[in-house]
Design a protein with these regions (language model features):
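RNase H-like, Mg2+-dependent phosphodiesterase core
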Residues: 1-214
Length: 214
């Protein structure tokens, strides 16, 4: 079976975007990375792609290798008309819950773009209620829209890089390996080394890893 080229992979996503652009003009894709981990931030990105400078290979970031995501990350930043990356830390996640924290990050990212879009497409089934720009949810948007796919790559790579840096400070937690997600290894390391400030208290309480009242 012939392997599809990057251009062939991205073609349907760019066709989707072209139809949206024909109706609305400038629009942004928004996506997040890191809703599920036990520690670290949730990262949200908004991106307005330049239709004259396509980035071939864009797809749902989870379907791409780390090497491919890294290469696309740099190309997206070089070619995009505008992009914004927002980090929402564990303290906000614990205070507001992960959904509200993510929605807040999406609002900040979309409204923080250097170009004000006429529409925001958000991956998933809901949009931030307080967003001052018209928005539409797109289920599986990161595999449907090139702009959302680009945002998913920006968010994923940004978060992974953050966790790699955190790993250098706390090598005993092996954050570079699991990126903070709730793996068996991660739970074993928490039991062995305890809790650090970058952990999400609300997540750990649900799993019985955080003393009540703290």
């Amino acid at each position: 079976m012939k392997r599809r080229s990057d251009e062939e992979i991205s073609a349907p996503l760019y066709e989707y975007d072209a139809a949206i652009r024909a109706q609305y003009g400038f629009f942004a894709g928004v996506d997040e990375a890191g809703c599920g981990p036990l520690c670290g931030p949730v990262v949200v990105a908004a991106c307005i792609l330049d239709p004259e400078k396509p980035v071939y290979g864009i797809n749902d970031s989870k379907k791409l290798t780390e090497k491919k995501r890294e290469a696309l990350f740099d190309e997206i930043r070089d070619k995009a008309l505008a992009y914004k990356i927002v980090f929402v830390g564990p303290e906000i996640i614990d205070r507001d819950n992960i959904l509200n924290a993510t929605m807040s990050g999406m609002k900040q990212a979309a409204e923080g773009l250097d170009i004000v879009p006429n529409l925001v497409l958000v991956d998933g089934n809901r949009v931030p209620a307080a967003l001052e720009i018209p928005a539409q949810p797109v289920v599986k948007g990161d595999a449907t829209s090139a702009s959302i796919g680009a945002a998913s790559i920006l968010a994923k790579v940004s978060r992974d890089r953050y966790m790699m840096e955190l790993d250098k400070q706390y090598p005993q937690y092996q954050l570079a390996k699991h990126k903070g997600y709730p793996t068996r290894l991660h739970y074993e390391l928490i039991e062995q080394y305890g809790i650090q400030p970058f952990y999400r208290r609300s997540f750990l309480k649900k799993q019985g890893y955080w003393p009540e009242g703290k």
